[in-house]
């Protein structure tokens, strides 16, 4: 949530600030001042992250007959703990888990998060709410820039670099984009520079606008929550197209590790190839 303030500055300082305004990465004087203050305060990453862990994991059966996706093992720890490791690498320790299916097991295992070096709160879904609905429920906890991550993927992303792009672009949402050889199985990003114009769903390989796909990792501003309809809602279908039309949706291509563990075949591939967060 942004508030209007009035500043009185030396004219020479203002000249230096204005010299950095280019209309692209730095939109205007207000934007330039915000970036300078963030840098001075060391606010180089969001302070809070949401992990979406409410799904049933039907494609991971029989494993998920007994345990939720959030607790499936990867290299001696749960899938979710690898996300904790990524966040802690950037000193992000205020984490919210959106839980639904088998939520009691998840909450019993992670409790308040102190055993894992984090502070953990929960958004409880009494019915499936999709990838966007839980954010509506957690609105009161999400009052400044925040991260959202799917809970069934392993990823290694430079969050500091991504956040810098997000702020410089004056984005309402920035999507981390990963590269795949065959984009025909995914929604593929069409971009103009860093701005996402649209996602083309499962194009023929030769007709794909790029090889960049949604990695299930986002940085958002609280204003995004006001665009989410009540009840079941998907970021991909109900929110991102609105942001793209507004010109406020951006993409951050990254080359780090990314594994989707959403089915047995992909999970087994991740077990073999994933390198733990250092």
Region annotations inferred by a language model:
Residues 123-125, 176, 252-254:
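Conserved beta-strand termini and adjacent loop/short-helix elements that scaffold enzyme active sites
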């Amino acid at each position: 949530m942004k508030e209007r303030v009035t500043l009185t500055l030396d004219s020479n300082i203002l000249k230096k600030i204005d010299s950095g305004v280019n209309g692209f990465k730095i939109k205007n004087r207000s934007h330039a001042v915000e970036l300078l203050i963030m840098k001075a305060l060391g606010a180089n990453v969001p302070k809070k992250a949401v992990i979406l862990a409410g799904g049933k994991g039907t494609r991971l059966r029989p494993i998920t007959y007994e345990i939720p996706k959030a607790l499936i093992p990867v290299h001696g720890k749960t899938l979710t703990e690898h996300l904790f490791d990524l966040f802690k690498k950037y000193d992000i320790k205020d984490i919210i888990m959106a839980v639904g299916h088998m939520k009691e097991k998840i909450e019993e295992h992670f409790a308040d998060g102190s055993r894992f070096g984090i502070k953990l709160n929960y958004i409880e879904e009494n019915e499936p709410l999709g990838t966007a609905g839980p954010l509506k429920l957690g609105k009161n906890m999400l009052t400044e820039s925040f991260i959202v991550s799917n809970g069934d993927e392993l990823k290694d992303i430079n969050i500091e670099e991504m956040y810098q792009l997000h702020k410089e672009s004056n984005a309402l949402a920035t999507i981390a984009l990963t590269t795949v050889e065959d984009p025909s199985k995914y929604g593929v990003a069409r971009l103009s520079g860093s701005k996402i114009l649209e996602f083309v769903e499962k194009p023929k390989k030769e007709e794909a606008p790029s090889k960049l796909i949604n990695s299930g990792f986002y940085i958002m501003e609280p204003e995004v929550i006001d665009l989410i309809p009540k009840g079941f809602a998907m970021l991909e279908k109900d929110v991102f197209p609105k942001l793209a039309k507004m010109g406020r949706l951006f993409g951050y291509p990254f080359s780090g590790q990314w594994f989707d563990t959403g089915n047995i075949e992909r999970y087994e591939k991740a077990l073999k190839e994933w390198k733990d967060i250092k």
